[in-house]
Amino acid sequence: MAKTPVRARKRVKKQVVDGVAHIHASFNNTIVTITDRQGNALAWATAGGSGFRGSRKSTPFAAQVAAERCAEIVKEFGLKNLEVMVKGPGPGRESTIRALNAAGFRITNITDVTPIPHNGCRPPKKRRV
């Protein structure tokens, strides 16, 4: 009995005009995810996945490269306007927003969604180097 060839389904590129850029900037890495208004991920990129390893992942330039890679993928969807949500204290916060702006997106608003505990969990002990 002959096997039927498995056909790879072609992803239909839907047209999205408005999107949300979620930037997670930690001290060690920066993750950029661009979604539509409903929260469905269109593209994502990280500083580590962009070819930076070790301490170079936590640089503003690595975050900028990750944002540029993400913007490149999302251009195919016809995205024009971006709402930016930044989470975390990392060094890639500002450079990521600048890179998205330079990529040609109109940034409608920037929101800081860093979680701040109301005296929740005990923080880790201070480093002694």
Curated annotation (Swiss-Prot):
One Gene Ontology MF term: rRNA binding
Signal peptide: none
Annotated Gene Ontology cellular component terms: ribonucleoprotein complex; ribosome
GO BP of this protein: translation
Record key words, sorted: Ribonucleoprotein, Ribosomal protein, RNA-binding, rRNA-binding
Source species, domain of life: Bacteria
Pfam families per the UniProt record, alphabetical: Ribosomal_S11 (PF00411)
UniProt cross-references to Gene3D superfamilies, sorted A to Z: Ribosomal protein S11 (3.30.420.80)
Matching InterPro entries: Ribosomal_uS11, Ribosomal_uS11_bac-type, Ribosomal_uS11_CS, Ribosomal_uS11_sf
Keyword Cytoplasm: no
Family: Belongs to the universal ribosomal protein uS11 family.
Biological role: Located on the platform of the 30S subunit, it bridges several disparate RNA helices of the 16S rRNA. Forms part of the Shine-Dalgarno cleft in the 70S ribosome.
Subunit structure: Part of the 30S ribosomal subunit. Interacts with proteins S7 and S18. Binds to IF-3.
Protein name: Small ribosomal subunit protein uS11
